From Swiss-Prot:
This is N-acetylmuramate alpha-1-phosphate uridylyltransferase. Catalyzes the formation of UDP-N-acetylmuramate (UDP-MurNAc), a crucial precursor of the bacterial peptidoglycan cell wall, from UTP and MurNAc-alpha-1P. Is involved in peptidoglycan recycling as part of a cell wall recycling pathway that bypasses de novo biosynthesis of the peptidoglycan precursor UDP-MurNAc. Plays a role in intrinsic resistance to fosfomycin, which targets the de novo synthesis of UDP-MurNAc. Gene3D superfamilies: Spore Coat Polysaccharide Biosynthesis Protein SpsA, Chain A. It comes from Pseudomonas aeruginosa (strain ATCC 15692 / DSM 22644 / CIP 104116 / JCM 14847 / LMG 12228 / 1C / PRS 101 / PAO1). Its cofactor is Mg(2+). Disruption phenotype: Cells lacking this gene accumulate MurNAc 1-phosphate. Deletion of this gene increases fosfomycin sensitivity. Growth rate is not affected. Pathway: Cell wall biogenesis; peptidoglycan recycling. SUPFAM superfamilies: Nucleotide-diphospho-sugar transferases.
C-alpha cells in the first residue's frame, strides 16, 4: 500500500516560523514532523510515499530527496496554487495508482500504528478518529458500535478526524481538476454507508500552533 502525506499548507498559525520554513519541516525535538511520519510509515512496512507541496515546497524536496535516506521512495506532486485537500489528492492519483492508499496530514503527530490500517471490500474510506481536542470540542463524525462512521449527533459522543485515513481512488470518481475539499466527498460516502472508522485512544496532536508543537516535544521527552 502507498501513502500520501499532505504537505501543501501555508501554516498560517505557525508564523513567523512558516514564513521561511514549510510547516512539515518544523522540528519536534530536533526531527522534522514529516520525517517522523515517514519513519513511522517505514516501520509499519509502508515505504512508497507520495508528498504534495506548494508553499516553500522546494525545501521539502531538497531535505527529503528521493526518500532513500529514510529507506523509502518519494514521488512529489507539486501544486502551483494550493488545491485544498481534495484537489491535491485528485491531482496525485496518477502517482497513487488504483489501489487503496494511506492518507496522512503533514502536521499530525501520533503513536498510531499504521500497519493496522486497511480498507474493507466495498468501502471508500476508513477514518481514524480521536477524542475531541480542546480546540475542536464539537468533533467531526460519530462512530457506531459496528465501526461505521456517521454524521455528528446532538446527543454527543462525537469524535474528531485525526488526519489519518485509508482512501479508495474511487472516492474521487466524477471529480474535476482544481481546488476542492475532501469533506464533501467523505460525507457523500458516509451517506451511502461506505465509510468505516476506528477510535484511536493513544497519543495524537494536531501540530497547528506553537503551543501544540511544545506539547509534542513534551510527550517525546517523556518517552525518550
Amino acid at each position: 500500500m502507498k501513502a500520501m502525506i499532505l504537505a501543501a499548507g501555508r501554516g498560517e498559525r505557525m508564523r513567523p516560523t512558516t514564513l521561511h520554513t514549510p510547516k512539515p519541516l518544523i522540528e519536534a525535538a530536533g526531527v522534522p514532523l514529516i520525517e517522523r511520519q515517514l519513519l513511522a510509515l517505514r516501520q509499519a512496512g509502508v515505504d512508497d510515499w507520495v508528498i504534495n507541496h506548494a508553499w516553500l515546497g522546494e525545501q521539502i524536496e531538497a531535505y527529503l530527496g528521493d526518500g532513500s535516506r529514510l529507506g523509502g521512495r518519494i514521488a512529489y506532486s507539486p501544486e502551483g496554487e494550493p488545491l485544498e485537500t481534495g484537489g491535491g489528492i485528485f491531482r496525485a492519483l496518477p502517482l497513487l495508482g488504483e489501489q487503496p492508499f494511506l492518507l496522512l496530514n503533514g502536521d499530525v503527530w501520533s503513536d498510531f500504528d499504521y500497519s493496522r490500517l486497511h480498507l474493507a471490500d466495498g468501502d471508500l474510506a476508513h477514518l481514524v478518529l480521536v477524542d475531541n481536542p480542546a480546540h475542536h470540542p464539537a468533533g467531526d463524525f460519530h462512530l457506531d458500535a459496528g465501526g461505521r462512521v456517521g454524521e455528528t449527533r446532538e446527543a454527543g459522543g462525537n469524535l474528531t478526524y485525526s488526519g489519518i485515513a485509508v482512501l479508495h481512488p474511487a472516492l474521487f470518481e466524477g471529480c474535476q481538476p482544481g481546488a476542492f475539499k475532501l469533506a464533501p466527498l467523505l460525507r457523500k460516502a458516509i451517506a451511502a454507508g461506505r465509510v468505516s472508522g476506528e477510535h484511536h485512544r493513544g497519543q495524537w496532536v494536531d501540530v497547528g500552533t506553537h503551543e501544540r508543537l511544545a506539547e509534542v516535544e513534551r510527550l517525546l521527552a517523556e518517552h525518550a
